[in-house]
Amino acid sequence: MVTPVQGLGHTLQMQVVEATPERVVMTMPVTAQHLQPWGYLHGGASVALAETAATAGAFLNCPAGMVAFGQEINANHLRSVREGLLTATAIPLHIGRTSQVWEIDIRNEQQKRICVSRCTLAVIKSDAPGATK
């Protein structure tokens, strides 16, 4: 299953490869629109990929009528990238009633880790479309 993502994820060309409550795998190509002025992957693009993967997994763990919103995210950028396909793998560290914490590992096509991130999400009640599973 490869599924495109909406919103910012769509703009950055992210795709969902796997999505379960225990693990989310997403990809994002590195193209000119993902680069900072010096020709390397913009750190914000990595963080957007990390939070998108964590949010997808968190939503799969939310009860009906609840959604997950990013509350805090950190990222360590370990290796620079100029092109290629990135793969983010998000796994839950904590699934609570009102919060979740996810760890996201982002690797390049050579399976070298380029970024590691941790994202905390608030679980809140919502009447937004799509909040009911």
Q: Which residues fall in each region the model found?
A:
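Terminal targeting signals and extreme-terminal segments of soluble enzymes
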Residues: M1-K133
